[in-house]
Amino acid sequence: MLKPSSLLVLILFLGGHSPAADLEPTLGKKGSLLLEEKFDGDTLPKGWTGKTGGLSVAGGALHAGQKKDDGRLGLFSRELPMQDAAIQIDFKFAGARGINISCNPSPGELSKHGHLFSVMITQRMWNITEHNDKADRNSVSKALVSAMESFESGKWYSLLVEMKGDEVVATIEGRKPLRASSKDFHVKKPGIEFRVSGRDGEEVLFDNLRVWELK
């Protein structure tokens, strides 16, 4: 029988880890818990859709990566209608170069086509980007706020993304939060979208996803 310390080492080696403490929002207070995913099984939970790249559940974590043959970033999503909300998720770079965590407008909310915003993270920086309107050739994406930061490969980090009204705040434990706003951010969203960049075999691991209403 494994000792508790040996069991913890095995869990960490396989990919899972102890849940991080809840990060507290600054735009409001947490309301109802809308979603909790611990990825304890060996199959993708209901509500997730893999579109491009690799996506699997193993060792207590969600593994995601880009595939060269797809010719685009690894893309997957979790359906969850929401508006004002707080999203907390743990992530760990395992070779991959970057991740985007995005929200889109629900159908009928805006005339704009494309994403509302993304929190983009690489091992050297992170930002909040407002995306272009794909229906407008003159529209361009722009980083509303960015910061140079180091995120080590093989280390778990906990990210909190808050959205309330026209404001978005992104917090990573131990880092100064990023804050941005836009007149379009207040709309209803159909779920959470993720992108991963990197070479074949390079991954990002995700774990302990929780989403709350933000009041």
Label each residue range with its predicted role.
Residues 5-15:
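Bacterial N-terminal signal peptides
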Residues 68-134:
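Secretory/extracellular carbohydrate-interaction modules
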Residues 21-50:
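Extracellular carbohydrate-recognition regions
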Residues 24-25, 73-80, 145-151, 195-196:
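Beta-strand-rich interaction surfaces with strong enrichment in secreted/lumenal proteins
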Residues 39, 89, 153, 158-181:
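Carbohydrate-binding surfaces in secreted/extracellular proteins
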Residues 180-207:
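Flexible glycan-contacting loops in extracellular carbohydrate-active proteins
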Residues 53-72:
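Short carbohydrate-recognition loop motifs
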Residues 135-158:
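Short, aromatic/His-centered strand-loop micro-motif at the edge of beta-sheets
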